[in-house]
């Protein structure tokens, strides 16, 4: 369990340094055969899980695939794309099913001698009410009907109140961790490629992924080959995506 001070100072990284790191990251399709050291992988994963996430429930998990035989089996599962020939692949999984254990973990691992009453109350009462959907999603259905009435009086959170909303909830936090992970590898000099092109059914069988886990991407990692980037970068004008209010 990693502990961090509550008053962590703002990072000394400059805007220019951050811009340089982000602009240097590209989706690389071809890698050399050079292995990624375990200490680099661990450091990057430690930075990945520092990503902001909903209620600190950290609904993610990662499978680090280094075994050459397993990587060879993954290649056709990933539509035989070149990026899937990387010397390291990390399966990034969203976990809508781990919130209950996470609530208990926060109480068990609280970094102070006494767990504040408000923390106990939130993780023993509020969070279970918020995230529990009940058998067949029936409790979620009850909450949706209850909120329709209660929300007439004041603003209320209206999600997640279904299994589908729980999946969205977990994916949002996990995507933040995945971005941390890619930038962390970039800072170590290793390129990445997030892959969505895979056969999920075969992927689950190959990696024995838990039934309720959601494979949101496979992250190829390695040293960039000479022709690793296929095309120049293209982004639409910012004005197409931003509204100032």
Please tell me what each predicted stretch does.
Residues 1-245:
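Acidic, surface-exposed loops and disordered segments
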